[in-house]
A protein has these predicted regions:
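Core AdoMet radical
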Residues: 109-126, 130-233, 238-248, 270-277, ...
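Conserved C-terminal portion of the radical SAM core fold
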Residues: 143, 197, 223-287, 297-326, ...
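Generic structural signal for well-ordered alpha-helices
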Residues: 90, 128, 156-163, 187, ...
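Canonical Radical SAM [4Fe-4S] cluster-binding loop centered on the CxxxCxxC motif
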Residues: 82-123
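Radical SAM enzyme core and accessory elements
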Residues: 1-39, 43, 326-334, 343-474
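An N-cap/entry alpha-helix motif that binds or orients negatively charged groups
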Residues: 38, 42, 46-86
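Short glycine-enriched, charge-decorated loop/helix-capping segments at active-site entrances
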Residues: 213-219, 290-294, 360
Length: 474
């Protein structure tokens, strides 16, 4: 019988079913154990994280005053490591041809009602120009799995195309990649093409449930999918992004699996996930969220975000436009550090608006605001919308990035970088109202940069940006 082993290379040993069940039972038995919960909150306050078992107890806790303390700590930890910066990105769908049979995704091979589309390099060019004209600097590439139509060569060529496009003052400076599990060799090629974070959602960590949800196609292989991040790391990609699709399975099980996956990467490679995404199942063409009885409430969603934030303090946390404005507002302060804005979830949706009957979207967007409206809203809430990609371009990835975050030194890098990239956005793309709000925020925030030397350089650079210069970074 297999034992639980965090640093094993085998999926069923590092995501160990019995260990998860034991964890959930332990959490259930201790959900009213105030002394233990208070002790865990104190441990979490040291900002060194919690184990999956400890985090599971906090997630089960249902005493209002303790939940309040957990939320309060999540906000403090977020403030300490990420300040009030929110990184902006947009998804770019390259192709929705797919050979898999995932029953919760409208791209599944049997769906005959969806419009299938694959962008040519020229169409990618048009999409990227549209994205640059909105002000985006960071993209997440999305593509269905199709060995002949979306081979790795197509993805690599697309990455090169995206980086090559310089339109007016626009530039895409980091391309993160969300494609199906692949080989060590292909991960190496992605790295060489300049890809940023490699993102792959587990969907669910429950093997049996996973196999039911993925009946056909290469993705039906649980171990191959679950061990993808190990292969990515072995292929030299040191920033990886994990996530589950909450609502496919019971949230407690997947929450525990997610943290075990993070512990596994830390144990085996010395560096945990760069990001964790927390999407929730939602309706789309041929998919009705109501068919999934495990869908979670906003209240539980907030709790999940808060506990992940204190359990893995060094990991960025991402939400998409599946979440409504109200839902996003709540979780931003509890731990989210990266959001998408102005997203189109259809293939080719940026260059031209999709016709209603030409449905190629992966899911229905709840937050339909433009990027400028999202930036304006963030400024209104006191956040710094950041278009920064400096760490990736300075080679501060993997353990170098983590060391910087852990030392708390990131404030002297990130704050000025965020302000300078926001300034670029205000100069080149913002509406007048957004520009005025942004200028005020930049004035206030520049004063808060701890290191006087860096503050002085930042002020000088901000002035240069106003005069038309671009692309400064610490």
């Amino acid at each position: 019988k297999m034992n639980y082993q965090a640093n094993s290379s085998k999926a069923e040993e590092f995501i160990h079913h019995e260990e998860i069940l034991d964890t959930l039972e332990y959490a259930q038995n201790n959900k009213d154990n105030r002394a233990l919960i208070e002790q865990l909150i104190e441990k979490a306050a040291l900002c060194r994280g919690l184990t999956h078992r400890e985090a599971a107890v906090l997630l089960e806790c249902d005493q209002p005053d303790l939940i309040e303390r957990i939320f309060h700590l999540a906000k403090e930890i977020k403030q300490k490591f990420y300040g009030n910066r929110i990184v902006m990105f947009a998804p770019l769908y390259l192709s929705n041809y797919c050979v898999n049979g995932c029953i919760y995704c409208p791209y599944h091979a049997k769906n005959k009602t969806i419009a299938r589309k694959k962008l040519t390099q020229e169409e990618i060019r048009r999409e990227v120009i549209a994205l640059q004209d909105m002000g985006h600097k960071r993209l997440a590439l999305e593509a269905g799995e199709h060995p002949s139509l979306n081979p790795i060569e197509y993805i690599l060529e697309s990455i090169r195309t995206i980086y090559s496009i310089k339109h007016k003052n626009g530039a895409i400076r980091r391309v993160n990649v969300n494609i199906a599990a692949t080989t060590i060799e292909n991960y190496r090629r992605l790295k060489e093409a300049g890809s940023g974070t490699y993102i792959l959602f587990q969907e669910t960590y429950h093997k049996e449930n996973y196999e039911t949800l993925h009946p056909t196609g290469p993705k039906s292989n649980y171990a191959y999918h679950t061990e993808a991040m190990d292969r990515a790391m072995e292929g030299g990609i040191d920033d990886v992004g994990i996530g589950v699709l909450f609502g496919l399975n019971t949230y407690r099980y997947d929450f525990t699996g997610l943290l075990m996956h993070a512990e596994h990467l830390e144990a085996r490679f010395g560096v945990g996930p760069h990001t964790i995404s927390v999407p929730r199942i939602c309706s789309a063409d041929d998919i009705d969220a109501g068919d999934f009885p495990n869908a979670i409430s906003d209240e539980i969603f907030s709790k999940i975000v808060a506990v992940i934030r204190i359990a893995v303090p060094y990991t960025g946390m991402i939400i998409s436009t599946r979440e409504s404005q109200e839902s996003r507002e709540k979780v931003l302060e509890l731990g989210i550090s990266q959001i998408s804005g102005g997203s189109r979830t259809s293939v080719g949706g940026y260059a031209e608006k999709e016709l209603p009957d030409n449905n190629s979207a992966q899911f229905d967007v709840s937050d339909t605001r433009t990027l400028d409206e999202v930036v304006n809203w963030l400024l209104e809430l006191g956040y710094i919308p950041s278009f920064c990609t400096a760490c990736y371009r300075e080679g501060r990835t993997g353990d170098r990035f983590m060391a910087l975050v852990k030392s708390g030194q990131i404030a002297n890098c990130c704050a000025p970088n965020a302000l300078m990239t926001l300034k670029e956005y205000l100069e080149d793309y913002a509406s007048e109202d957004t520009r005025q709000k942004g200028v005020r925020l930049i004035l206030n925030e520049t004063e808060r940069i701890p290191n006087p030397k860096i503050r002085e350089i930042a002020i000088r650079n901000l002035k240069a940006i106003a005069e038309g210069k671009r692309d400064f970074r610490f």
